[in-house]
Amino acid sequence: LSSAASDVYKRQEKGSIGKAYGYQLGVKHQYKEGMMDQVDRVLFDLKNNPYSRRIMTNIYVHQDLHEMNLYPCAYSMTFNVTKEPGKDKLVLNAVLNQRSQDILAANNWNVCQYSLLLMMIAQACDMEAGELVHVIADCHIYDRHIPVIKELISRKPYPAPTVKLNPEIKDFYKFTTDDLIV
């Protein structure tokens, strides 16, 4: 790569992206109910106040940007709970906001990982997974990727796989890769 991103990779501490992504989600914050990280807060609110319009994560923390090797691309999720008439379970929907996306390198990963995250959170909160709306401010294809993308577009599509989770897992933090059923 000959881009600003490749310079970042050269500078970064081996194996670390700095204070981005997981680091930000794991920072404990004081709430009136006690200390929680962002994931714990989402789980708490979904279980205790599911119709709140304040259930979200945000990992674009300006005071820590200088310690991130890359600014977060996918930076916030907002959760919304609905109830379908005639059904007992609530439905968990989410909006994923992303400032930038390299369509070839990231799109499939982002869609899969955040869809799976939505499914895991829904199951842990005894809800059904609903819609994931993915908002990308700058979705781009680099010139050097055009031949590969043309090749991919020309291929015969296969049916999308069906993805399920082990229904026995009720604790978000107990999921393992073995609980993903494709």
Give, region by region, the residue ranges found by the protein language model:
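A generic structural signal for solvent-exposed, polar alpha-helical segments
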Residues: 2, 27-29, 81
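Cys/His-rich finger/ribbon microdomains and the adjacent scaffold used
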Residues: 7, 13-45, 52-73
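Single conserved hydrophobic/aromatic residue that forms the stacking wall/gate
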Residues: 1-5, 9
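Mature extracytoplasmic enzyme cores
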Residues: 175-182
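Conserved helix-adjacent loop modules within structured domains
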Residues: 48-56, 60-173
